[in-house]
Regions:
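Active-site-adjacent structural elements that line small-molecule/cofactor binding pockets in enzymes
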Residues: 1-338
Length: 338
């Protein structure tokens, strides 16, 4: 099982972060899209390491499939086959009010988006005429002037982020992997996600094993009880943010926490962010995440997720590239998980 870590947005410290992560034994770097652009850190990761580097995730709908296809092609060529394209939808409000793009049912639209990117790549790789015509995206023009140089390696794998069975089915049907949302507990993965991926794979007449599951959930570690409780409180704050969103309600309903979803949503509308994490119970933290000493968590990740996931994300060093005080300890934990 690969062990991955998160690379923050591009900064003057990015090269140090990349080199530190590789020295610790991480297999992959993941660049997200919060208050930063997700593709620029990927370039730095590919240039200054031999690790896999993935967008995890880049928000799809504000970007044309052509733009993303071009970016993915260039990064995969530059990194000699070490780039992975991770895409996500974000929620309706952010698409409409932050990115100013129209919203439509996300799962079928993401399916079409992935197929559009693959069609563009196929044209560049084979020379076949570009003729993709869907409900949301149409790509029918490609001339030699705008065709990128040949790629010597395989096409980049495409991963899609998802929480519900709808997106899991899409991943199983057309993607190379599913980036599991942090609100997916191990039980939810077994009972909801894996059957949905298998259903999607059956539609494409392929094995479910062709769609990897990548876990990036909640982890709280502490070598003392005081440190562990502080880490669990930090997780509770993150859970309260996700659990206040109605889009993520299915994962909460699965565990019987729908009332907490309603209460958190109400507090979020009122802007009472500081009060929200108090509603997150220890049961929620322990069910959704992995908690304990570093070694306890490492073994739990390996035992619980190793049989079903190809990779886990573990950001055990808070300040990569700066804090080397726990290098030997963290390297040992990474080795256990693998």
């Amino acid at each position: 099982m690969r062990v991955e870590t998160y690379i923050p947005g591009l900064s003057k410290n990015t090269v140090d972060i990349v080199k530190h992560a590789e020295a610790l034994g991480y297999d992959a770097l993941v660049s997200g899209e919060l208050n930063n652009e997700p593709f620029l850190p990927v370039l730095m990761g590919l240039e200054h390491s031999q690790m896999i580097v993935r967008t995890g995730l880049a928000i799809a709908f504000p970007r044309s499939p052509m733009t993303v296809a071009n970016m993915g092609w260039d990064l995969q060529s530059f990194g000699d086959g070490r780039f992975q394209l991770g895409l996500g939808t974000q929620v309706k409000g952010h698409n409409e009010r932050r990115f100013s793009v129209p919203w439509s049912p996300p799962a079928p639209r993401m399916r079409e988006y992935i197929l559009a990117v693959k069609a563009i790549w196929n044209t560049w790789k084979t020379g076949e005429k570009l003729d993709f015509q869907g409900e949301h995206y149409t790509h029918t023009l490609m001339t030699p002037m705008f065709t990128p140089p040949p790629m010597e390696c395989d096409l980049p794998p495409i991963y899609v982020s998802g929480l519900g069975p709808g997106m899991a089915r899409i991943a199983g049907e057309v993607a190379d992997g599913l980036l599991l949302h942090p609100m997916c507990s191990p039980q939810y993965i077994h009972e909801v996600i894996i059957p949905a991926v298998a259903e999607g794979a059956k539609k494409s007449e392929r094995s479910p094993d062709e769609c990897e599951l990548l876990w990036g959930g909640f982890i709280a570690t502490g070598e003392t009880e005081e440190d562990l409780q502080a880490a669990k409180r930090a997780i509770a704050a993150r859970i309260s943010f996700y659990a206040s969103t109605r889009t993520y309600r299915p994962a909460l309903e699965f565990h019987g926490w729908e009332d907490i979803n309603e209460a958190l949503h109400k507090l979020s509308i009122e802007g009472k962010w500081e009060e929200m994490f108090a509603l997150v119970t220890d049961e929620m933290v322990d069910t959704l995440g992995f908690t304990g000493t570093g070694k306890e968590v490492a073994h739990a990740l390996k035992d619980n997720l190793g049989p079903i996931c190809s990779a886990v994300m573990w950001n055990e060093v808070e300040h990569l590239g700066v804090d080397h005080s726990k290098d030997e300890h963290v390297a040992g934990l990474i080795e256990i998980v693998k």
